[in-house]
Design a protein with these regions (language model features):
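Phosphate/oxyanion-binding active-site loops and adjacent basic polyanion-contact surfaces
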Residues: 7-11, 40-47, 86-94, 157, ...
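Short, flexible loop/turn elements at secondary-structure junctions
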Residues: 36-40, 52-54, 72, 120-125, ...
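Active-site activation/catalytic loop segments of kinase-like enzymes and analogous catalytic loops
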Residues: 92, 96, 276-320, 344-367
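Active-site acidic catalytic loop and adjacent metal/ATP-binding pocket
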Residues: 45-57, 228-282
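Generic recognition of stable, solvent-exposed alpha-helical segments in well-folded globular domains
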Residues: 89, 152, 156-159, 242, ...
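Regulatory N- and C-terminal appendages and interdomain linkers associated
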Residues: 1-43, 53-63, 222, 234-237, ...
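ATP-dependent phospho-/nucleotidyl transfer catalytic cores
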Residues: 139-248, 257-263, 367-402
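Conserved ATP-binding subdomain of kinase catalytic cores across diverse folds
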Residues: 46-48, 53-197, 282-283
């Protein structure tokens, strides 16, 4: 596959403002070094590591590491991302929302961070972007996506989500509702046609009928898929009577990084990629995180225990932040999970097959899209997982959403 050439703006990057937040007066930038050999292209996005050499007043040289995430390309998928305001939403979260969430904890004596620090370039590069600290340079790592989160990693992720959710609930209590960019996310009537395109079930349904359990589920899924987007829009219309939070909505193995100490224990967890955040029931994030990225052996076996673990930390954070409204009950979360079967269905039919692909397989362009979709649903790991997941969902009445 032909690798796209580096964007033209790479040679004109200026990071003076970003660097100033790290250095003292008298320090000066010696060089800005985009690591073009490490550039990654995926999903109409370019990820570019940038090294900055700073000469300090004592003449020693300090290296700072940033990561630039920018829109790339003008194809159909790029236009969809622009229409759905994915970079606009993520920029707003990094620069406006996360700092305020962290300030809520800071005000009660707790140091909690949710993701990398974000900065602004000195001048426009002609495309939307997110400039952030490079967590890899600080020792953060992803888990192997094919294996997913083991029990300890999963607990760390759920604890971080509980803190994130609690902060969002207190934020709304203190400052009022989120703007429409976050309250509705991508799930707006105006986006129905695009959502229909993105959720085309043809590849999934054509392979489903070939599975051992496929004949049992194919007919009902084919009928349900006809109204899936319509039902999604209704599901994601937030219910003011339920306990609502800002959901990450894309919390899978690739979008979480961990920092370990010398003993191999997690000392910090960072969330990444806030392009599709949305206000609503925490059931959305619980299904997304556990069903997409928990290790196969714990995905279903530990599901209820992990919901309870999440709830414990949610309550802990709500109390720490002095949440003034009625506290949710565990039964409320369970009831919401039972009502969000469609959310679970979308995760296992749209997200799980991607998480089980090899890393290189999702770094493709349009020419490879149809071949990739086919390989997603013929992947033996995915079929084996679904042989367990679909009966589990059926037993819990999570497939009755039509």
């Amino acid at each position: 596959m032909k690798v796209p050439k580096a964007p033209e703006w790479v040679s004109a990057l200026s990071l003076e403002q970003a660097v100033q937040s790290y250095v003292d007066n008298g320090d000066r930038i010696v060089a800005v070094l985009p690591s073009v050999h490490l550039i990654q292209f995926r999903n109409c996005t370019v990820l570019l590591p940038i090294q900055v050499k700073v000469q300090q007043r004592d003449s020693t040289v300090r290296r700072l590491s940033f990561l630039l995430k920018a829109q790339h390309g003008n194809d159909f998928q790029a236009k969809i991302m622009d229409h759905l305001k994915m970079f606009v939403r993520e920029h707003y979260v990094y620069h406006k929302v996360l700092p305020r969430f962290e300030q809520l904890f800071e005000a009660v004596g707790q140091k909690v961070s949710f993701g990398p620090r974000a900065f602004k370039l000195d001048r426009s590069i002609g495309v939307r972007y997110i400039l952030m600290e490079n967590l890899k340079a600080k020792g953060y790592r992803n888990v192997e996506r094919g294996k997913g989160f083991d029990l300890e990693y999963l607990k760390q992720v759920l604890r971080k989500l509980a803190q994130f959710h609690a902060a969002s609930a207190v934020y709304v209590e203190k400052r009022g509702k989120f703007n429409q960019l976050l309250s509705s996310g991508i799930y707006r009537k105006a986006n129905q046609e695009i959502l229909q395109e993105l959720n085309n079930p043809e590849a999934f349904l054509s392979q489903l009928r070939r599975w051992r359990i496929g004949t049992h589920f194919h007919k009902q899924f084919a009928d349900k898929e006809e109204v899936l987007v319509e039902k999604l829009l209704k599901l994601h219309a937030s219910d003011p009577k339920q306990f609502n939070v800002l959901n990450h909505c894309d919390c899978w193995a690739n979008n979480v990084m961990f920092k370990l100490n010398n003993q191999g224990n997690v000392v910090d967890t960072a969330l990444l990629d806030f392009q599709v955040v949305k206000y609503g029931s925490p059931a959305n994030d619980l299904y997304y995180t556990i069903l997409s990225s928990a290790e196969k052996k714990i995905k279903l076996a530990e599901f209820d225990n992990m919901v309870q673990y999440y709830f414990y930390h949610l309550m802990d954070s709500l109390k720490i932040l002095a949440y003034g409204k009625a506290l949710p009950q565990l039964e409320d979360i369970r009831e919401s999970l039972s009502k969000h079967g469609l959310a679970a269905y979308v995760v296992v039919t749209r997200v799980l097959p991607i998480t089980l692909m090899n890393q290189f397989e999702d770094e493709v362009n349009e020419l490879y899209a149809s071949k990739m979709k086919c390989s997603m649903f013929t992947n033996r790991k995915y079929i084996l997982a679904m042989n367990e997941i679909l009966p589990w969902m059926e037993e819990r009445s999570l497939l009755n959403w039509k």
